[in-house]
Amino acid sequence: MFYIFAAVVVFAGIYVLGFNAIGITTCIFLLLLVACAAADLNKGIIPDLIVIFIAVLAVINFFINETFSINGLIDHLIGAVCVSVPMLIVSLLIKNAFGGGDIKLMAATGLYLGWRNAVAGLVIGLFIAGVYSLILIIFKKAGFKSKIRIAPCLAFGLGAAALFGNLIVRLLFGW
């Protein structure tokens, strides 16, 4: 099943973005998100190695796909901080709100996507996680204090932001 989903993700990336440098790096990014989601579902942990691969891909992507500028660099650096630091603060204030892997994943993906798309991906991912949690509570599969694995939800939101980021940002925020 994993292979079928991975193939669909690659097809979607190439279909939406084309068979070029942007499309290929985005497909690699999407496959790494699928690996994070699968690892979180199976083991309850996001491997640091996958997060490091995403961060390295972000640096490679910046030099391949972006016209190098100080503003572009700042946009991506802010992306790493603006989504992960609030998650870290919430996690420190509310025990078990987010796992360390989720926070590191958001830092690396923020570096890859830039701040606007990272925020959009986080909003979508947390919305999906909220709906999923609500369904679990309604059907008495979990309680309000239960821990859920949100990497699959975040991966979906971040993947959507990678493929349709500008459209999503305009629809959500009007930027």
What are these regions (language model features)?
Residues 3-8, 51-58, 103-105, 150-155:
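Core segments of transmembrane alpha-helices
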